[in-house]
Amino acid sequence: MGNYRYMKEFDKNLPNAVLVDLDGTLALGKGREWFDYDKVINDQLEFRVAHIVRSLQQQGHKIILITGRDEECRGVTTEWLDANLTIPYILYMRSHGDKRSDSEVKLEIYKQEIEKEYNITTVFEDRNKVVDMWRQQGLLCCQVYYGDF
């Protein structure tokens, strides 16, 4: 079988969780530049992704939000999430000043904080490079929008 697709095995002793990207996936930052952190409070909720995430949470999945946003905007990000997502979540953010690519940052967070603690049933992401990275880890990744940037 030349087209074998690697999928990570589940550990039945671990809780199930989903990974969800923020910008371009759950949060739509219309009218702001990516680094305009003072404006993220005005982002629109991508209601279709939010509906799926809420449904998975109701079925017992932990919701893990993983973003390339700098840690400096944690306050406004959690304020937006609490007002818009309205379910329990765990939030991982890029360390302040970390200039590495999103895929590098998210892979490191996954390896250090998430991989041995949860069965990741699904990942929601928009950026091609990050989608590819998740799939290389054997995770089912749903790409929610065009992400060639």
What are these regions (language model features)?
Residues 12-13, 59, 113-120:
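Glycine-rich phosphate-binding loop signature in dinucleotide/nucleotide-binding domains
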Residues 62-64, 90-92, 122:
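A structural signal for isolated positions on well-ordered beta-strands in alpha/beta enzyme cores
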Residues 1-20:
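Non-catalytic pre-domain segments flanking phosphatase-related domains
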Residues 71-119:
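Substrate-recognition "cap/lid" segment bordering the active-site pocket of phosphatases
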Residues 34-64, 71-76, 104:
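Short, acidic loop-to-helix structural element flanking the phosphoryl-transfer center
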